[in-house]
């Protein structure tokens, strides 16, 4: 005779069959219902519990599906052997100390971070209309797409890059992926090593390369970009550069330095490569942009071109793309032929139409006007708040950030604390020193204005002046 301790509560909100299933499973795990025990018939148990036969049947079927019960023809249900979880040692493991409470997060009054963009500039209505039209007209969006990227998007990108960035490629050379870091991580195993990166530079690129086992050396940046002289002295076989807008200094690599870089790669054909991250190339305010390094090298040159839509559209639109030299395509396809695409076809086809129907270039023109006005307002506010000679601005002509180098600066740690206290979110040039050995970077603010509100530009200069004064006072009293 099986004695069950099951108690069901019709008012609990949990279905009765679910309650019965949980109760019986618990008794089987605890050993109260031993292996081999024959369970009561469904009608009998239903009568004992005052529930319907369907309720008992549903619970039994769930228990059988999960291996607690075995159904034997014309015999009923029997409890299966259950391997209990190993018991914990007496006293259990030593409990970790309770986490310390997090310090309160102060509200951000001025967002001067370098990765921000202005969501108010996003073309919501156009983007939504294109997506709606695609939903009604493109049932293939629900099927598997090309792992290298949707053909329509790759065609649109090839035409756009040729016209506006001088990139020489066909659609078959373009790979679309969910973010620059993702593509860089796939590219790294295809190239020789070691690799050279810029310092100050992009910490994420360095981390991705190192995570893929690439030995990296950090080479200095001067007023023309990465030092090719230092590159020649290194043993690097790959060079990662941001020539259109060196991040975070804002330096643009001139044509002469670009030619030197290409000559460096050409001295060892097939053994040296340049990874060109065309970061913020869309945002050049005062002069025409130089053509890409890839365009100078040609479709089968030593340059791999990388770019992303995270700045021109929105960070949440995870569409980045890479242009591979012709001779690397067979290597790529062999290594990644079984990989799936990482960007939805829906977003890819939306972007393809956004480009081919002319919306993208108009959107960029609108952004350039808005960001240029914001840059001018920020620079004017800084020049008004600080006395002549107290502050030197640099990196104004490209990208969405500028540098503000302080004369006789307080320690960077004091600047960080003072900025946080005033609700200012910013970076310091030393944050991007990838060697930790560049004292000249101290006292230089990296001020992004992509997320800065237009109405905040007038007062941000005085607030930063206040931050510097507070940092100096704090460093004197320490």
Feature-to-residue mapping (PLM):
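Active-site PLP attachment segment
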Residues: 74, 296-332
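Short glycine-rich anion-binding loops that position phosphate/pyrophosphate groups of nucleotides
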Residues: 117, 244-246, 311, 452
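N-terminal basic, amphipathic alpha-helical segments
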Residues: 1-132, 139-142, 327, 333, ...
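Conserved core of the PLP fold type I
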Residues: 131, 140-271, 282, 286-300, ...
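Residue-level marker for buried hydrophobic side chains located in beta-strands
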Residues: 112, 274-275
């Amino acid at each position: 005779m099986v004695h069950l301790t099951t108690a069901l509560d019709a008012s609990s909100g949990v279905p009765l069959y679910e309650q019965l299933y949980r109760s019986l499973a618990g008794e089987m795990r605890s050993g109260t219902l031993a292996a081999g025990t024959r369970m009561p018939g469904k009608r009998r148990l239903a009568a004992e519990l005052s529930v319907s036969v369907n309720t008992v049947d549903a619970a039994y079927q769930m228990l059988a599906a999960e291996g607690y019960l075995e159904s034997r023809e014309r015999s009923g249900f029997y409890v299966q052997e259950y391997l209990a979880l190993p018991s914990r040692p007496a006293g259990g493991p030593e409990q970790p100390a309770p986490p310390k409470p997090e310090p309160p997060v102060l509200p951000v009054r001025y967002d001067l971070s370098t990765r921000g963009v202005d969501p108010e500039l996003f073309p919501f209505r156009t983007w939504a209309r294109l997506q709606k039209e695609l939903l009604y007209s493109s049932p293939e969006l629900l099927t598997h797409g090309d792992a290298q990227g949707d053909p329509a998007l790759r065609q649109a990108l090839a035409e756009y890059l040729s016209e506006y960035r001088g990139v020489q490629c066909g659609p078959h050379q373009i790979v679309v992926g969910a973010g620059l870091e993702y593509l860089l991580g796939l590219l790294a195993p295809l190239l020789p090593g070691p690799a050279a990166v810029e310092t100050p530079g992009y910490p994420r690129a360095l981390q991705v390369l190192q995570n893929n086992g690439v030995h990296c050396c950090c080479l200095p940046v001067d007023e023309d970009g990465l030092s090719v002289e230092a590159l020649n002295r290194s043993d690097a076989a790959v060079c990662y550069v941001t020539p259109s807008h060196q991040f975070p200094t804002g330096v643009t690599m001139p044509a002469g330095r670009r030619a030197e870089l290409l000559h460096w790669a050409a001295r060892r054909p097939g053994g040296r490569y340049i990874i060109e991250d065309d970061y913020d190339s869309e945002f050049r305010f005062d002069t025409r942009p130089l053509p890409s390094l890839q365009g100078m090298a040609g479709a089968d040159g030593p340059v791999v071109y990388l770019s992303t839509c995270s700045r021109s559209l929105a960070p949440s639109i995870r569409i980045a793309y890479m242009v591979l030299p012709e001779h690397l395509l067979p290597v790529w396809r062999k290594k990644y032929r079984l990989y799936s695409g990482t960007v939805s076809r829906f977003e890819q086809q939306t972007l393809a139409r956004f480009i081919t129907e002319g919306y993208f270039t108009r959107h960029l023109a609108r952004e350039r006007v808005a960001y240029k006005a914001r840059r001018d307002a920020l620079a004017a506010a800084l020049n008004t708040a600080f006395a002549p000679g107290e502050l030197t601005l640099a990196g104004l002509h490209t990208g969405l950030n500028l540098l503000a180098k302080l004369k006789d600066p307080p320690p960077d740690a004091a600047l960080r604390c003072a900025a946080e206290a005033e609700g200012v979110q910013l970076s310091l040039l030393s944050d991007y020193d990838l060697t930790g050995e560049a004292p000249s970077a101290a006292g230089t603010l990296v001020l992004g204005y992509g997320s800065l509100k237009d109405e905040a530009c007038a007062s941000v200069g005085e607030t930063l002046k206040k931050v510097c004064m507070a940092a100096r006072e704090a460093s004197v009293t320490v």
